[in-house]
Amino acid sequence: MMQGLRELWGKIQYNIKRVMDSDPAATNVWMVIWTYPHITALFWHFFAHRLYKAGWPTLARRIALHSRHVTGIEIHPGATIGRGLFIDHGMGVVIGETAIVGDNVTLFHQVTLGGMSSKKTKRHPT
């Protein structure tokens, strides 16, 4: 568990640094932590993804639903998210179950990484 918390803290620090380096409107660390919704969404996704992989999909989806209501950003617990994802003006961003988002990706509002297939196959972008 401690390793997981260290990993979470490392990802949060990396993401905050990425925002500070990328967004001139980000004037301090506390502003990023408290007012950038994607930081909150990524925090909840960290836990939801682990629950999803551990065989607890309903609880994972419930956490993801809470995150969506709070942030306006929908990240399926099955999605794989790399380090340094920056979702600027994130309202309406949707990242689907089989999507793989690499390191240091920037997304803006109203982006959907989704698919239309009802088959249980890879159906989201990588």
Q: What positions do the PLM features span?
A:
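Terminal amphipathic alpha-helical/low-complexity segments used for targeting or macromolecular assembly
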Residues: 1-67, 71
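Flexible, glycine/small-residue-enriched loop-and-beta-strand segment within the central core
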Residues: 53-126
